[in-house]
């Protein structure tokens, strides 16, 4: 029996090593720079996915704007996958990241958010420090999480604007302590009517263009510093 248990333990250990090596293999090398324009790197959830092309269009003459094709999801997922996304940029001048909608969500009817408030603050701090380590000289910007549709819909994974407000406050506290500029997207969209939303949290095409213009102007200002 002891021999069988030992064999099983060894097998599990080997699986762990293989999994770790698999993760290490995903670490990408920096991309080659293909433009003389400064690079801007956008990281974030589906809200970022909604406006990133508009940011690129707005800044086409002044910056090379890049982003991961996938949804960066919650703060822990973002932290874990930062090394995977190194191959997207070479030496970004500005990096804006956001995460929060997933973090505050009570997934599939859970009683608590996916990420506790304290865990969220810790993850934001670690993301900031990792980005600074991986991209020396880049200006790191934190973008706050946007509001829920004021009509009260919340989708399957419940979250509220009040939840978002609390988590934003924690993230901003961390960002300011780390001397990171904050792009307050929450404040920018807070008074938008329900007609600017496509569903419970995501924006219409026209609203995304407006949000993209705002993000572009903010990041353009960071390039000049």
Predicted segments — roles?
Residues 12, 35-36, 151:
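Compositionally biased, low-complexity repeat tracts
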Residues 7-16:
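Bacterial N-terminal signal peptides
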Residues 8, 44, 99:
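Residues that line or immediately flank small-molecule/substrate-binding pockets and catalytic motifs
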């Amino acid at each position: 029996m002891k021999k069988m248990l030992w064999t099983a333990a060894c097998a599990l250990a080997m699986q762990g090593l293989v999994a770790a090596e698999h993760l290490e293999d995903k670490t990408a090398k920096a991309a080659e720079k293909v433009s003389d324009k400064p690079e801007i790197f956008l990281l974030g959830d589906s809200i970022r996915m909604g406006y990133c092309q508009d940011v690129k269009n707005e800044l086409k003459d002044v910056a090379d704007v890049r982003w991961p094709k996938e949804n960066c999801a919650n703060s822990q997922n973002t932290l874990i996958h930062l090394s995977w996304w190194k191959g997207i940029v070479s030496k970004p001048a500005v990096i804006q990241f956001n995460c929060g909608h997933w973090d505050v969500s009570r997934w599939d009817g859970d009683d608590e958010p996916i990420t506790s408030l304290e865990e969220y603050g810790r993850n934001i701090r670690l993301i900031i420090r990792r980005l600074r380590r991986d991209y020396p000289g880049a200006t790191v910007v934190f973008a706050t999480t946007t509001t829920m549709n004021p009509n009260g819909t919340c989708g399957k994974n419940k979250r509220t604007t009040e939840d978002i407000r609390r988590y934003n406050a924690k993230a901003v506290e961390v960002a300011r302590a780390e001397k990171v500029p904050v792009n307050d997207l929450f404040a920018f969209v807070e008074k938008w009517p329900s007609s600017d939303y496509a569903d419970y949290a995501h924006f219409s095409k026209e609203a995304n263009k407006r949000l993209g213009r705002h993000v572009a102007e903010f990041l353009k200002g960071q390039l000049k510093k």
